[in-house]
Amino acid sequence: MNKKLIISLSILCVVIAVYLLNSHFQKTYNSSSKNLMNITEEGLKKIIIQSGQEAIELIKEDSVWNIAGNDTLKIKEQVINRFFDIASKIEIQNTMTSNKEKWSKYNVDDSSGVHLALIDMDDKTINYYVFGRSKTDFTRCYARINQENEVYLLSENIIYNLQSNPTFAAFS
């Protein structure tokens, strides 16, 4: 009886020690996710979106965003607000590749990607992104940042908010 009690207490001590070690190591684990875009609408003058041969240039005049070269179509304020809201929440989840040869697999090469340039008040490009569609998960997408080779998996799919056709219904 005494031997069974000692064995039981020993097992209990081992389980408690494993639990405490696990808790300690879990506290030291840090997530590596970070925000993709740290932008505000106030610092931007232009947004250029290009997909294939189509491109659209959005220009901020005073506090209103307009489509360059188009007097009849107006951008709804809610479309711009939704873009900045989604853009501020997107996180980089994983690095998928650093190999330029694999860009086409993630649809972030120059011909198949959706390009986004953010230009400040001094006409300098502050950020340049190439987004690619995921073939398996339509709620997320891939991105290259500022002409770097790394391709990242993002937490959300922003491509649906990047329409390069000015007659797209959200802009009319």
Feature-to-residue mapping (PLM):
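Secondary-structure "cap/kink" motif recognition
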Residues: M1-S172
